[in-house]
C-alpha cells in the first residue's frame, strides 16, 4: 500500500490507514489531502480518502473519489478492496464480491481480502464459493486455528458434514497431547461437541457416541454433554440407558419440558397428536405420580398430566393444580391452561369445577370439601379465571358479568381492567376496550406492558394519534417515533398499518407494513458480524443454529402478516388507481409511444432521486466534518405518498408474493393472494396453479371455493384464443379441468350447489355459496340473499352451567354484512342482517348493539351519568385518573365497570 509514494508520503498513507482503523477521520482526511496536494492522481490515496468520507456519511463524494481511484490505478488491489468495502457498507454484497474478486486477481494471496470475501460469501449463502475461499485461507495459513474451523464449517453449511468431520480430525492431529491449556478449555469443548453434532447429523450415531465418551474428560460443559449423550442413546436404541439419563437430567431441572418429552419417548408413551390410548394414559399416570413424589415443587410435573388425563381423573388433577394457584393469585393461570380448550370435554369440566369453587368460596369461604378458610383474594382470582373462560367460549355477557363482579370485589387490581378491555374487544366494542385499557394504564404509569396493551387497543379502535402519544411515553427523548421504529416494534407497525388500511389511508398503511419488511432486512443484516465472531470465539453450534434461523427468517408470523397486508394494499391500488389528466392522455397514445414516455419518466425519477441524495448529503456535510456520523435524515415521505404513486402495483405485489411462496408455501393466504395477483396480471396458468394449491390445502375452505368458481367462470367468458400461446394455454386448462374433483361432469352452478349441500349449517360457507350464485347468475340475487338470511345461529353444546354459547363469530357476521351491502348491493338486506346480529352481539359497535358505547342510553353511558350526578362511583379511580394518567380523549367516553 502506498508503495509508489516517496517515504514521507508513504508514512502519511500509513497514517490514513491507521486513522481509519481508529476512527480518527479528520486526522485521516488531513493526511490524505497532504498527499493529494503533491500527487493529485494517486489512486490508493483517493480511495482511502473516499473510504474515510464514507464513514462521515458523505457517500456521494466517497463513491466519486473511490471510483476515480480505481480508474487512476486499476491494477491496485487496494483500490478494488476499498470499492468493495463501500459496497459492503451499503449492503450491495454482490457488487462487493465482484470487487473483492478483482482485487484477488491482482493479489491472489491477500489474507485480508480473502477473509472479507469469505464473510460476504457466508452472508449471501454462496456456499461453494465459501468452501473454496476457506480452503485457500487454510492453505495460506495452516497454523491458524480459525482457518481450520472455518473450512470445516463451510463444508458443513455446504451439506457435507462427513467432510467437515474429516477436517476437524485433521486439525486435532496437529494438536499436542496436553492440549488444551486452562484458558482454552471452553473453546475446545465447543469444538468437540460440534464434531459430535456433525457425526450425529451425518447419521453416524454409534461413532458420535464413541467420540463423546472418549473425549468426556476434556468436556467442561457437563450439561451439554449429558443432553448430547441422551439424544444419541435414544437414536441408537439404547432406551434403558436413555431413560436413566433423562431421569438424571430431570433431577437437575424437573421443569424442562424437553426432558419430559424425551423420557416419554424412551418409554414409548409420547404422542405427537395429543391422542392417547387407555394403556398409555395408565402408564403415564403412574409415571407422573412417581415423579410428583420426587419433585413436589415442580410445576411441569403437575401440569403435564392435565394433557393426557380424562374425565374424573382429569377433574381431580386439575382441581389439585389450580387450587393453590387461585389461593396464591397467579394472573397467568388461564393462559397456562388455555391449550386444554382444544380438547372436546375438558373446558366443560373446568367450567363446572371452577363454578363449584366460586360458589363454595362465596358461601363458606373455603374450597369444596375443605375446612381451610381461603383469603378474600381467592374469590377474586376465581372470578378472574371464570371471566377469561367465558370470554374464550364466546359468552361475552357472562364474561362481563364475572369481571364486573371481580372489580366490585377488589377495584384496585390492574389485571381486571386489562381483561375487561380484552373481553370488550372480543365482544366488538373497540372504543370501550381502548378506554378500559387506558384506565388500566392510568393505574400504573410505570408499567410498560400495560402501556403497550393500551396502545394496541387504541390502534384497534382507529385512534392512531392517541396511540402514538401513548406509545412514545416509553421511548427516548428526542425523535420519539423514530426511536419506536429503531426498537423494531413490529406489533406496533402492523397494528397501526391495519388501522390506516381500515381508514383508507393506503400510503401510511404501506409505510407501516414495509417498515416490518425493513426490520427483517435489518435482522438479516445483523448476522454479518457473527460470521467472524463465532469462528473466533468457537461458538460453533450456536453459529450454525443462527444461520439456519436466518434461512427461515421470512417464514415467521410478523413478516407473513406484513407481506400479506402490503400485497392487499397494492391490490387496492391496482383496483382503484388515481386517474390524472396525464394518464387520460397516455391512454390515447400508441403502445410504442407509451413505452418511450415510461422510459423517460423512469430516467427522470432516477435523476431526481440522485439529486435529492446529493442535496441531503450537502445539507448534512457541516455536521459530518466533525468526524462523527450524522443524525438520521428527515424522512422525505412521512405519509407514504410516494409509495402509492407506484406505476405498477402488481409488480410490487409480486415481489412480496414470491417471498411468501418461498417461505410460507403451506399458508392458504399465500395461494389466495397468488390467485388474486395473477388474475389481475392475466397470468391464467399461474392463477390456476394457485387454485390447485388452495384446493390441496383446504378444498372445503370458502375462499378456495370462491377462487375455483371465479377462475373457471373467467375462462368460460373469455373469447376464443387466437395466438399459439393462447391456444396452448387453453389446451392445458381443458386437460387439467377433469382433475378437479369438484368439477367432474358438473357445471359451475351444480358444483356450487353441491358445496352448499356439504356445509348447510355453516354461515361462512352459505355466504360463499350465495356470493358465487349471484356472480354466476345475477338474476338469482333474491335467492342468494335468502340463503344467507335462512342461516341459523345454533347453540354450541356445553354443560350450560351459565348461559349458552352460539356458533356464529363476530368477524364472520361482519363479513356477511359487508357482502350484503357491497357485493350483493342490497341495503335493506344489510339493514335486516345488522338488526339481527345486534341481538347476538349487543356490545358490537359495528352492529350498534344496545350495550355498545355508541348508544347514549346503553348500560355504559347510564353508569357514567350516575357517577357524574354524585351517585356511588362504580370505579375506584373515579375522576382522579381522568386528571392523573388517563388521556383527555376518553373523558367523555362512558364505560361501566
Curated annotation (Swiss-Prot):
Keywords: Repeat, TPR repeat. Auxiliary subunit of the NatA N-alpha-acetyltransferase complex. Required for male gametocyte development, embryogenesis, suspensor development and the formation of the quiescent center (QC) in the root meristem. Involved in plant immunity through the regulation of SNC1 stability. Required for embryo development. Expressed in leaves, roots, shoots and flowers. This is N-terminal acetyltransferase A complex auxiliary subunit NAA15. SMART domains: TPR. Transmembrane segments: none annotated. Residues 578-640, 863-897 are annotated as: Disordered. Residues 863-872 have a biased composition (Polar residues). The gene is NAA15. Residues 602-617 have a biased composition (Basic and acidic residues). Part of the NatA complex. Associates with ribosomes. Interacts with NAA10. GO terms for cellular component: cytoplasm.
